[in-house]
Structures are given as C-alpha cells and as structure tokens.
Amino acid sequence: MLILDRLLTGLHDACAAFPDKRKGAGDYSMADIGLSAFSLFFMQSESFLSYQRSLEEGRKTSNCHTLFGMAKIPTDNHIRSMLDPVHPSHLQSSFDQVVATLREKGGMKQFERLGGRTLIALDGTEYFWSQKLGCPHCQTRKRSNGKTEFYHAMLAATIVAPGHNMVVPLMPEFIAKPDGAGNRTASAMPPSAGLPRTPRA
C-alpha cells in the first residue's frame, strides 16, 4: 500500500500540473479531474463515478476520497471538456515513476530474461474511430462503400517476461500525421487528441 500511495501521490502531482483553460477558480481542481479519469480505468467501470457521487451526496464520503484522495467528483462531461486540451506528455513523469519505483524496490529483476535483458512488447492499437466525428489530428481511411472513417491510433510499449503474469506499461506514442502529409508517424500527439475519452460513434 505504501508503494501505491507513493504512485498515487505522483499521479496527483502530475494531474495538478495539467494546464487549466479556465480563467478563474473552478469548482474542481485539475488534480481531481485527472484522478477521476484515472479511477474509471482503475476500477474498470463506466458507472463508477456516478455511483461515487451518489455516495458523496448521501454519506458525505466515497471511495474516490479514500482510495484516490480526491476532494470533489466532477461529472463525466466536465472531465472530457477539461482533459481534451491536455497534452499526453504531461503524464510522462507518472509512467517513469512506475519504472523507477520498481527498480528501487528490486521489482524489475522479475522481468529480466536472456542474461539480464528486459523484453518490451510493441503493439499498435486504435482507441477511437467514427464515421461521424473527426478532428484535425485524425487519421482517415476510405471504406469500400465510399464512407470516410476517422480514427486515432497509438503504439503501446509494455515490459513483459515469459512466465510472468504481470506487465509494466510504458508511455505510449500517439500516431499522428505530419502537417500537410497523409503518412502516419509515431510522435507526441498534438493537444486535444491525447487521452482515450470518446466511445465509437
């Protein structure tokens, strides 16, 4: 639990440093907004935040407070609105901290194979596509029916080891097209196109 608390503190600090497009003080801190998004992935439940808000209203506390140290729970729409402009690179320190903590505690030794080497698995994946919604940073493709699809993709890197049932995700590279070109390249995605946030439409 001490290691988890340390990692959550690092994530809290990274989220607190997110650029804030609001000109005045908002109802929710950027730390609470970022941690709310993280909690959805951590708990793997789309209804997690709405249920926690109902607990907060009835009991004045929730798992968001006790597990993630959040002060207030924003709505899903507010989370999307505030995180859209945040560049993924603001989370680099959180990914680095996971590896650094494992090295410090000797956890990386479990992943060493082939004479002390660390194996990294690479996988390209799409995390958004739509025939209705698109943005200037979307990749595009034509289907046989003539319709255009818009999509975002990334190259995911993960530390793995044969016979080990756990993996360590590294900072992904978001696949963006260069300005004025149609070819794809792995690079840091421009603002508003970074974090997985929108379901298929």
PLM feature spans:
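Short, flexible active-site-proximal loops enriched in glycine and acidic residues
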Residues: F48-S50, S62-P74, L91-F95, K109-Q110, ...
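Short, motif-level signal for alpha-helix interfacial/capping segments enriched in acidic residues
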Residues: Y51-G58, S93-G106, T185-P191
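Residues that form generic nucleotide/phosphate-binding pockets
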Residues: G10, A14-F18, S54, M82-P85, ...
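Active-site-proximal, Lys/Arg-enriched surface segment
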Residues: R80-H164
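Electropositive, glycine- and tryptophan-enriched low-complexity nucleic-acid-binding patches
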Residues: K142-A201
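Gly/serine-rich nucleotide phosphate-binding loop at the start of the catalytic core
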Residues: I3-P74
